[in-house]
């Protein structure tokens, strides 16, 4: 039979030391055969805790990203929030992807971050603007070329596994630009936990 330990007992001296963990309800739980130590990766754990978020912008086949056009997503996090972020970008043709920090932006469309745990009511401590006016790009932190190929069988790509830890109170600009010469489907997905 598992034993659940309340927080008040953490200061009690005991002869036995048993591993324990704090669950999503902030209850200290002793490890046992019925309650094994969770061993999921941190991203998976944050997802179940309701601390994983995402933002996605898609230019579908019916409304392709024009040649020379960009998807600009500006994001900043509240004081004390060091978001661990992963980006995923894909496009149907040649494209360039950049990340800038210390960007200065105005206007744009305020968009919500969505919780990746659809059962959680937790909200992100972020502010996101889609396609704002960029007055200062800031410092380039990352740059990547997404090759699309040539001819009728050309196709873009993406899907790296780069991850970043973002500083609080700093505006970051994520820019995906279609450099193919023709309109193409494109998307940018930002996922993070706080």
Residue ranges of model-derived segments:
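Beta-sandwich interaction modules
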Residues: 145-169
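Extended, low-complexity segments enriched in Ser/Thr/Gly and acidic residues that occur primarily
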Residues: 1-121, 126-139, 144-145, 177-187, ...
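Internal, hydrophobic beta-strand segments that form the core of beta-sheet-rich folds
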Residues: 166-178
């Amino acid at each position: 039979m598992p034993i659940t330990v309340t927080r008040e007992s953490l200061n009690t001296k005991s002869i036995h030391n048993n591993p324990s963990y704090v669950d999503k309800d902030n209850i200290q739980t002793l490890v046992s055969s019925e309650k094994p130590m969770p061993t999921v990766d941190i991203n998976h754990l944050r997802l179940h805790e309701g601390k994983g978020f995402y933002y996605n912008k898609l230019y579908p086949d019916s409304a392709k990203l024009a040649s020379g056009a960009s998807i600009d997503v500006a994001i900043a996090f509240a004081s004390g929030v060091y978001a661990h972020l992963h980006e995923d970008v894909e496009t149907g043709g040649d494209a360039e992807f950049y990340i800038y920090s210390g960007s200065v932006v105005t206007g744009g469309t305020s968009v919500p971050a969505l919780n990746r745990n659809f059962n959680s009511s937790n909200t992100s401590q972020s502010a996101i603007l889609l396609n704002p006016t960029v007055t200062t790009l800031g410092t380039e932190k990352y740059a990547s070329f997404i090759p699309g190929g040539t001819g009728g069988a050309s196709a873009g790509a993406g899907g790296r596994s780069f991850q970043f830890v973002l500083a609080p109170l700093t505006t970051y600009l994520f820019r995906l630009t279609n450099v193919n010469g023709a309109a193409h489907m494109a998307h940018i997905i930002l996922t993070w936990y706080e």
